[in-house]
UniProtKB/Swiss-Prot annotation:
It is found in: Cytoplasm. This is Probable dual-specificity RNA methyltransferase RlmN. The keyword tRNA processing applies. It is an enzyme of class 2 (transferase). Its EC number is 2.1.1.192. It comes from the Bacteria. Binds 1 [4Fe-4S] cluster. The cluster is coordinated with 3 cysteines and an exchangeable S-adenosyl-L-methionine. Its main location: cytoplasm. GO terms for biological process: rRNA base methylation; tRNA methylation.
Length: 368
C-alpha cells in the first residue's frame, strides 16, 4: 500500500511480460508473425476475422484454417491471456462486473452496463493504480503493473461476445460506448492504451470497427501525456478527474496535482478539445463536507464558463475503510445549481453497480 500522497508513474520492474497477442500487433506485423512460423501471410487476416469480427478465441471454431495450423497460430498470436474468475450482476442482471485472472495471476476487473438506449463497458488499463487518490479503492491498492494492449482489448472482445450471445438481458446487442475508467490511469500506460484504441477502432477485420467518438479516456491530469494524446488525432472524448477546483484541496484529493496544478490540467484539456473537436468532460466525485460546498461549485462554474465542457458529478461510492461518504441531497442540489448558474452543462451520474462494488472508485479486484 502506498504512503499518503506517494505517486507511481512507472510500473514496478520485474513483472513477467504478457505473451504476444494479435491485438498487440499492427496488420503488417501480424502477417510477419504468421510468416515467421511457416504459415502463409493471409492466415493473419483469417485469424483477425475470427477474433475481431466473430469474437472466436477457440481454435475449434476456425474451420477455414487447416486443423494442423490452428494450434501453432493460437500459440503464436492468440494465447490465453486471461480467464474469468467470476461474474457479479445487479440491476436485473443488466450490470455485470467481471473479475479476471491474468496469465501471471494478477487480478483486474471490468464492468458491462446495459441501458435502454446504449451499452457501455468500463475497462481497466492497469492492474491497480499509482495515482493514490485517497477516496478510490483502486488508488489505495497501489500499482502492480501495466496491462498489455491485448489484455485491454480482450476485455472488450469478451464483452461484445457476451452481448451477441444474449448473456445480458435484453436480447443480442452491440457495444455503444467504451470508457477507460476502470482500474488504472490510462495515460500512465500510454503506448498500450493508444494501441488498444487503434485496435478497437480499425475497420473489421483489422480491428473491432468501433467509433472513436464512442470512446472516453479518463485521466487525473498527466499534462505532458494529454498534449501527446492531442497529437494522435483521435476523436475520442477526454475526461478529466478533477474533484476540486482549487489547488489546496486537489493536492490532497488528487495527489498528482502537486505536479500539475488545476489551471495547467484544464489548459491541456482545452487544447485537446480544440484539436479533437470533442467537448471536454469534467468528472467530480461529491464528498460530504469535503468538496461539495456551493462556493466550490460556483468557482468551478466560473472556471468552465463559455468552454466546450460537460460536468459529470458522481455521488461518492463507498469503499472499505473510507472515512468519507456521499454528499447530502440538499448539498448536491446546491452544487449543481451553482455550476448551472454559469451556463455550464452539468448532470449527476446514474450510479450503476454499487451493490457489487462495480461503481466508480470501487474496483479493487479481490476474490473475497
Amino acid at each position: 500500500m502506498p504512503k499518503p500522497g506517494e505517486l507511481t508513474f512507472v510500473a514496478p520492474r520485474g513483472a513477467k511480460k504478457p505473451p504476444r497477442h494479435l491485438a498487440d500487433l499492427s496488420p503488417a506485423e501480424r502477417k510477419e508473425a504468421v510468416a515467421a512460423i511457416g504459415e502463409k501471410p493471409f492466415r493473419a487476416k483469417q485469424l483477425s476475422q475470427h477474433y475481431f469480427a466473430r469474437y472466436a478465441h477457440d481454435p475449434e471454431q476456425w474451420t477455414d484454417i487447416p486443423a494442423g495450423s490452428r494450434a501453432k497460430l493460437q500459440e503464436a498470436l492468440l494465447p490465453d491471456l486471461m480467464t474469468v474468475v467470476r461474474h457479479l450482476s445487479t440491476d436485473q442482471d443488466t450490470t455485470r462486473k467481471t473479475l479476471w485472472r491474468l496469465f501471471d495471476g494478477t487480478l483486474v476487473e471490468s464492468v458491462l452496463m446495459r441501458y435502454p438506449d446504449r451499452v457501455t463497458m468500463c475497462i481497466s488499463s492497469q492492474a491497480g493504480c499509482g495515482m493514490n487518490c485517497p477516496f478510490c479503492a483502486t488508488g489505495q491498492a497501489g500499482l502492480d503493473r501495466n496491462l498489455s494492449t491485448g489484455e485491454i482489448v480482450h476485455q472488450i472482445v469478451d464483452g461484445m461476445r457476451a452481448l451477441r450471445d444474449g448473456e445480458i438481458p435484453g436480447g443480442p446487442a452491440r457495444l455503444s460506448n467504451i470508457v477507460f475508467m476502470g482500474m488504472g490511469e490510462p495515460l500512465a500506460n500510454y503506448k498500450r492504451v493508444v494501441g488498444a484504441i487503434r485496435a478497437l477502432t480499425d475497420p473489421e477485420p483489422d480491428g473491432l470497427g468501433l467509433s472513436q467518438r464512442g470512446i472516453t479516456v479518463s485521466t487525473v491530469g498527466l499534462v505532458p501525456a494529454i498534449h501527446r494524446f492531442a497529437d494522435e488525432g483521435f476523436k475520442c472524448r477526454l475526461a478529466i478527474s478533477l474533484h476540486a477546483p482549487d489547488d489546496e484541496l486537489r493536492d490532497t484529493l488528487v495527489p498528482v496535482n502537486t505536479r500539475w496544478k488545476v489551471r495547467e490540467v484544464l489548459d491541456a484539456g482545452w487544447e485537446y478539445a480544440a484539436r479533437s473537436g470533442r467537448r471536454l468532460s469534467i468528472e467530480y466525485a461529491l464528498i460530504r463536507d469535503i468538496n461539495d460546498q456551493a462556493w466550490r461549485g460556483d468557482r468551478l462554474g466560473r472556471m468552465l464558463k463559455g468552454r466546450p465542457v460537460h460536468v459529470n458529478l458522481i455521488p461518492l461510492n463507498p469503499t472499505p475503510g473510507s472515512k468519507w461518504t456521499a454528499s447530502r441531497p440538499e448539498d448536491e442540489k446546491a452544487f449543481v445549481e451553482a455550476i448551472a448558474a454559469h451556463g455550464v452543462p452539468v448532470t449527476v451520474r446514474d450510479t450503476r453497480g454499487q451493490e457489487i462494488d462495480g461503481a466508480c472508485g470501487q474496483l479493487a479486484a479481490t476474490e473475497r
